[in-house]
Amino acid sequence: MDSAPNFIPRLLLLSLLIVSIPLTSSQSDANTTNPSPSPPSDSDLCNGVFVSYTHTKGSKIPPNDTANQPYRFESVITVLNHGRDELKSWRVFVKFAHREILVSASNAVLSDGSSLPVSVENGTVFAGYPSSDLKSAIQTAGDVTQMQARVELVGTQFGVAPPNVPLPKNITLATDGWKCPKATQKGTNVLQVCCIPDPDYDNREIIDNEFLPRKDGDLTIMYDVVRSYSSNYMAQVTMENHNPLGRLDNWKLSFDWMRDEFIYTMKGAYPSIVDSSDCVDGPQAKHYQDLDFSNVLSCARRPTVIDLPPTKYNDSTFGLIPFCCRNGTILPRSMDPSKSSSVFQMQVYKMPPDLNISALSPPQNWRINGTLNPDYKCGPPVRVSPSQFVDPSGLPSNRTAFASWQVVCNITQPKDASPRCCVSFSAYFNDSIVPCKTCACGCSSNKAARACSATAPSLLLPQQALLVPFENRTELTVAWAYLKQRPVPNPMPCGDNCGVSINWHLATDYRGGWTARVTVFNWGETDFVDWFTAVQMKNAAPGFEKAYSFNASTIGINGKNNTIFMEGLPGLNYLVAERDGENPLKNPRIPGKQQSVMSFTKKLTPGINVPGGDGFPSKVFFNGEECSLPTILPMRSSQHRKHISVFLLALPVLALLILRA
C-alpha cells in the first residue's frame, strides 16, 4: 500500500516523456525537409514572350592575325511564350556587333532570304522554321516543347578573344504587335528581354481566323497549294507588283527547298537549268524507284525560275496559265494592271517523312531580281488564310486553296551598291552641261588596270557631247575645258559607266510658267520595251501641265503628290539600244533616245525659284531604279552674254573636232 503513491508520479513522468519525444522529432523533420523556396527565374516572371541570347562557347581559329583575328562562336537563342495567346510566326532581331559571319542556325531561317553562310555584322532577323508558331501554356497545359523555340548558332566573329564574350548589342522580338524594352545583360554571357503585347495593336483578326493577316509590300508572292496528294502537290506562285515605281524585266525567282523536294513539271515558267542529276545521285531516286527522272525538270536545292516568251502562252504543255509568258515583265499597275502580275504552276514531289496529304512546307529564302530594276529583299513565307480562285468550270463559285503562304518583298538599296542609271543637268542660262558623276554606276576596283581617275570630278561638257559615247568625248571635253579656262586633271576622270542616262534641261523660265526638256539615252545593248521614267519635284510638281511627246501624269507616293510619271506614247514605247553610226569606221555609235518637252505653270506654285533649284528634280527613276544625280546645278552667271559669245567663237573649233572624230 505504501508503494502506490510513488508509482503514480513515476507513471505520469514516463507518459510525459513519451509524448514529448515525437513532438521534438516532428519539429526537427519539418525544419530539414521544407527549405525556403528558391526565387523564380527571370523567364517565370515574364508574362509575355521571353527572349534570351546565351553565348556557350568560343575558340580561336586560323589564320593567326593579331590585327584581325577570327574566332569561332557558339550561342543559343531561346524564345519562350509565356503569354496568354499563341505566338504566330515568331521573329527575333539580333543586333550583332563584332562583324559576325553566320555559318549555321538550327530551327530558323534568316527573314531577308539570305542563304548561309552570310555576314550579319549589321544585325539580322531570325524567323522560325520549320515550326514558326509557339503555343501558350494555357493551350498546352504548360508543355514547354510546344511553347519554346531554341535556335543554335555557329559562326565566326572578329576581335573578341576568350574568355571575353562577344555578346550582341541588343535582341528583341520582331513580330508585329509586341513591345520590348532594351535587353539586359545577366552575368557575362547572357542577354535577355521580356516583351509584352502592344495595347495599340489590333490582333483580333489573328485570334478569330487563326492566320496572320496579309501584309502590304512593294512586291508580294503568294504560294498556294491548289492540289495535294500524299507524295506530291501542285503549287501556284503569283507575283504582284504594288509599288507605283516598281518594275521587273526578265525576272528571275529563286528559293531553297528545305526537305529534299524536287520539281517534276511546270506551266507558265521554266527552270533556268533543267537538270535531274541531283535526284539520281541522291535519296530521291532511292525512294521513287519507279519514277522516270529523265522527265524531272529540276532537282536543285536552290532552283532559279524564269518566265516564258509570249509564244508559249497558248502552248498546252507549258502555257495556258493566266498572266504568264511575258518574258519576265511585271509593270506598275498605273501603266497596265493586266501586266502587273505574273503566275506559274509547278508540281512538287515530297520526300519522307512528309508523305501524307497534309504535310505541306513552302520553300524558304526567296529572292527575285531583274535587269536594270530595283533590288528586292523578301521575307519568309507566312501562313495566311487560304486563297480563293474563280472556279475554272465557269460556275458562280470560288475554289479554296489547300494552304497558302505569303512572301513580302520590298525595294532596298544594298550597302555599297551602285546605281544603274545617271542624270545630267543643263539650263538655258549656261552653255555647259553638268554631266553624270564620275563612276556614277561603278568603276573597276582594279586601280592598276584603270587609265583614269575614279575620284576626280567629271568635267563640264558642251551640248553636242551628250550624243557622243564617253570613250569618244575626250577631245571635245578637253577643248571645252580649255575654252572655259578650267583645269584638266591628269589622269582624266573615269566615265559614268551607266547603261542609261537622262538629261534634264531647263529650257525656259517666264513670268507665268517654265518648261523643261527630258531626254532619255540608252547606251546598252538591250532594247527597253514599255519603259518609264519618273522625276520627283519637291516644290514644282503641283504646277505640272503636260508632256508633249510622253504620256505623263502626277502620282502620289508615300502620301506626297510630287512625282511625275512618264512613259512612251502608244507606238513609241521602245527605247532602242545603242547602234552603229552611219559610217562605223568613222562615226561614233549612236544611243537610243526618247525626248519630250514638259510645261509647268506658276499659278499653283507662287514663289518657286526655278533656276535656283526648284526647276530640277530631287530624284529621278528609270524603270524603277533610282538614278545617280549630279551634286551641283548649272550656275546662273552675270556674264551669261559673254558666255554666249565665247560659245559662238568656239563653234568652229568644235565642228572641226567633230569632223575629225
Curated annotation (Swiss-Prot):
Positions of the UniProt region annotated as Disordered: 26-45
InterPro entries: COB_C (IPR056900), COBRA_pln (IPR006918)
One GO CC annotation: Golgi apparatus
Signal peptide: 1-26
Membrane topology per record: Lipid-anchor; GPI-anchor
Tissues expressing this chain: Expressed in roots, stems, leaves, flowers and siliques.
Protein's name according to its UniProt entry: COBRA-like protein 7
Gene this chain is encoded by: COBL7
